[in-house]
């Protein structure tokens, strides 16, 4: 599914503060990284990013607390590998927030167009959504230092 559009809803570079421990999230960076649909309004994006930050921060709350107890006041102070001058932990956090934001927006996109072609598009989005949720879980597990094996019992 193509999520690019020549239209733009004038997404401003709003900065979402993720608390004192986690890095801030920039709306324009999200939009550039995740190839958002031009129909995305600033209000929808704000809601989706805010919700994703809340959920990811809750998932990582015990890990965050253990890092603070070790003396690390913020994620970027934790010893980690660096990629392009940024901590891999910060990059993984961003991936988790961006993927959850996009998964939530994509899930809601499916119910917008109820025509036959819209129904076929919606069916095709299932795989994309599953991959985004997988990316969220893998990023969270990597931040926690866990492997990203997911086992399903039959």
Please provide the spans of the model-predicted regions.
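Conserved short "hinge" loops at termini or chain/domain junctions
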Residues: 1-77, 148-154
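A short linear-motif detector with a strong N-terminal bias
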Residues: 1, 76-77, 84, 129-131
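Charged, low-complexity surface segments at secondary-structure and domain boundaries
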Residues: 31-36, 78-86, 121-125
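Sparse, context-dependent recognition of short Cys/His-centered cofactor- or disulfide-binding micro-motifs
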Residues: 7-10, 15, 82, 86, ...
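Short loop/turn elements at secondary-structure junctions
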Residues: 86-154
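Short, exposed interaction segments that mediate macromolecular assembly or regulatory contacts
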Residues: 69-93
């Amino acid at each position: 599914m193509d999520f690019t559009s020549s239209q733009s809803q004038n997404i401003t570079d709003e900065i979402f503060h993720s608390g004192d421990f986690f890095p801030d999230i920039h709306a324009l960076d999200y939009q550039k990284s995740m190839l958002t649909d031009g129909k995305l309004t600033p209000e929808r994006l704000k809601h989706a990013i805010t919700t994703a930050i809340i959920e990811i921060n809750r998932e990582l709350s015990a890990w965050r607390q253990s890092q603070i107890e070790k003396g690390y006041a913020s994620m970027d102070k934790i010893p980690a590998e660096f990629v392009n001058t940024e901590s891999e932990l910060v990059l993984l956090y961003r991936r988790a927030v961006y993927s959850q934001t996009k998964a939530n927006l994509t899930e809601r996109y499916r119910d917008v167009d109820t025509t036959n072609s819209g129904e076929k598009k919606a069916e095709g989005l299932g795989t994309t959504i599953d991959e985004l949720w997988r990316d969220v879980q893998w990023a969270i597990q990597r931040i926690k230092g866990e492997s990203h094996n997911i086992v399903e019992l039959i």
